[in-house]
């Protein structure tokens, strides 16, 4: 379902790593570095919180899409992909949330 969309977006973001920053928003963010990307992720997370408080489902979906997109840019900055996050979610599927949390604290 959504894997192909995430994969296509991820490929575009990866391609933008080598694009001219004057011609691509993603290239600008990647060129400016991690602090600029983190600032944008924090901004988008705040917008998600506000959209949730507004109780407007379509606005919430819009803002979550922005947050996911900018998080994917952050992942790309670290040479990671959305697929890595999906793999982690898949690994956790079927695990009790409490058991998974306990396993993290034991490590």
UniProtKB/Swiss-Prot annotation:
Gene Ontology MF annotations: ATP binding; phosphoribosyl-ATP diphosphatase activity
Classification via InterPro entries: HisE, PRib-ATP_PPHydrolase-like
GO biological process terms, semicolon-separated: L-histidine biosynthetic process
Pathway(s): Amino-acid biosynthesis; L-histidine biosynthesis; L-histidine from 5-phospho-alpha-D-ribose 1-diphosphate: step 2/9
Cell compartments where the protein resides: Cytoplasm
SUPFAM superfamilies: all-alpha NTP pyrophosphatases
Any coiled-coil regions, as ranges: none
Known EC number: 3.6.1.31
GO cellular component terms, semicolon-separated: cytoplasm
Principal place of residence: cytoplasm
Catalytic activity, as annotated: 1-(5-phospho-beta-D-ribosyl)-ATP + H2O = 1-(5-phospho-beta-D-ribosyl)-5'-AMP + diphosphate + H(+)
Keywords: Amino-acid biosynthesis, ATP-binding, Cytoplasm, Histidine biosynthesis, Hydrolase, Nucleotide-binding
NCBIfam families per UniProt: histidine_hisI, PRK00400.1-3
Family recorded in the similarity comment: Belongs to the PRA-PH family.
Identification of the protein by name: Phosphoribosyl-ATP pyrophosphatase
Organism (species): Neisseria gonorrhoeae (strain ATCC 700825 / FA 1090)
Gene behind the chain: hisE
């Amino acid at each position: 379902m959504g894997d192909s969309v995430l994969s296509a977006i991820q490929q575009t973001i990866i391609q933008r790593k080598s694009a001219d920053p004057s011609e691509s928003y993603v290239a600008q963010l990647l060129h400016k570095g991690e602090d600029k990307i983190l600032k944008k992720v924090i901004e988008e997370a705040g917008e998600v919180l506000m959209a949730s408080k507004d109780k407007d489902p379509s606005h919430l979906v819009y803002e979550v899409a922005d947050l996911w997109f900018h998080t994917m840019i952050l992942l790309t900055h670290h040479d990671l992909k959305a697929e890595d996050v999906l793999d982690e979610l898949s690994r956790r599927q079927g695990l009790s949330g409490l058991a998974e949390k306990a396993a993290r604290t034991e490590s």
